[in-house]
Amino acid sequence: MLRVRCLRGGSRGAEAAHFIGSRLGRAFTGWVQRSLQSTQAAAASQNRCAAEDKAQSPAPKECPVCSYNEWDPLEEVIVGRAENACVPPFSVEVKANTYEKYWGFYQKFGGESFPKDHVKKAIAEIEEMCNILKKEGVIVKRPDPIDWSVKYRTPDFESTGMYAAMPRDILLVVGNEIIEAPMAWRARFFEYRAYRRIIKDYFNNGAKWTTAPKPTMADELYDQDYPIRSVEDRHKLAAQGKFVTTEFEPCFDAADFIRAGRDIFVQRSQVTNYMGIEWMRRHLAPDYRVHVISFKDPNPMHIDTTFNIIGPGLVLSNPDRPCHQIELFKKAGWTVIHPPVPLIPDDHPLWMSSKWLSMNVLMLDEKRVMVDANETSIQKMFENLGISTIKVNIRHANSLGGGFHCWTCDIRRRGTLQSYFD
């Protein structure tokens, strides 16, 4: 086996560079010296971030990524794009995560664009959302536009893409680290490409960058005979711990995790398996504790329309999907709020989600929340809690599968690492 020894900086590194250069020429000497300088600079930047994280102090400007929870003052965020959004092919994992009334839509339009007029309106809504975030003092970054209609093939499957609309699904920020999730839908296999420019920039400025093991998405990852004929079937299967994804290899969507300082809560869902959860648990230990919680939910996918933590010891808990472990939160002194019934009309298309996007809100800090302009009931709920509402209409953007929390990934919040669940 070929073994390669890294040259470290300092006097020994310089001597090694000189020795190699004398053997292989001046060009190589220059390359080695530049490599040493680059490595030393990157290490120094990385060490600054690591030291700041351990010291539990806010990351300074040198480290652009720093977020420990869902409510500290928001300074920088990635907001997704609806441009070029395509309907995913109607594969078994898509079928398991969507409502039967839309199956014909997927069968007919899989691989093609979502209705263009609808997407155009969604684009305009998200642009307005970005403008409002900027007015509130938040730095906004956007993923690159990509043609998602291009068909691709791996040794295990072929598919077209979907979109880069929901950064919450693919990116998870924990402290000064940004983690790319190994998502479970084949149509999302190459979604990371839209974010690479942004993440490389964060990395070059000192942030940690981790990519979880990429799943092959071979047929073995999915229960090809997953029975989903009715809502009753889904309830039984979820109660039995049976999902369309198997334990063949790790997979998870970042949106199945929600952060509260040292404690991170996750659900086993149609897109997040126990192998994926265990990978995260080992990766984040010992500084963070990963807790598995569950709900009475016939079709679990993404925790933030079921259980959305909006402040220290303050959580929105979906009354239609009660948490089986809710007493643990109450014993820990948390306040559990049941949000009101959503007001979204029955005839509004929701191709990938439920009406409970109303509770999928984005906290700008403990006293400011971005909420849908049409959802007057939940606005009143927040006002009664002493939280001012920033109202934005993203009704057409909702149709693509997300609310404010889904459409964003908070990159930097001004705060420190604390425990809220002791």
From Swiss-Prot:
Active site residues per record: D253, H302, C406 (amidino-cysteine intermediate)
Listed A to Z, the keywords are: Membrane, Mitochondrion, Mitochondrion inner membrane, Phosphoprotein, Transferase, Transit peptide
Q: Could you tell me what induces this protein? A: Transiently induced by estrogen, with levels peaking an hour after hormone injection.
Question: Which SUPFAM superfamilies does the annotation name?
Answer: Pentein
Subcellular location field: Mitochondrion inner membrane
Listed under GO biological process in this entry are: creatine biosynthetic process
Q: Where is the transit peptide?
A: 1-37
GO cellular component terms, alphabetically, are: mitochondrial inner membrane; mitochondrial intermembrane space
The pathway this protein participates in, as annotated, is: Amine and polyamine biosynthesis; creatine biosynthesis; creatine from L-arginine and glycine: step 1/2
Q: List the disulfide bonds.
A: none
E.C. numbers: 2.1.4.1
What are this entry's molecular-function GO terms? glycine amidinotransferase activity
**Reactions this protein catalyses:** L-arginine + glycine = guanidinoacetate + L-ornithine
Which residues are annotated with the PTM Phosphothreonine?
T416
Subunit (UniProt): Homodimer.
Q: What does this protein do?
A: Catalyzes the biosynthesis of guanidinoacetate, the immediate precursor of creatine. Creatine plays a vital role in energy metabolism in muscle tissues. May play a role in embryonic and central nervous system development.
UniProt lists the family membership as follows: Belongs to the amidinotransferase family.
Under which name does UniProt file this protein? Glycine amidinotransferase, mitochondrial
Q: To which species is this protein native?
A: Gallus gallus
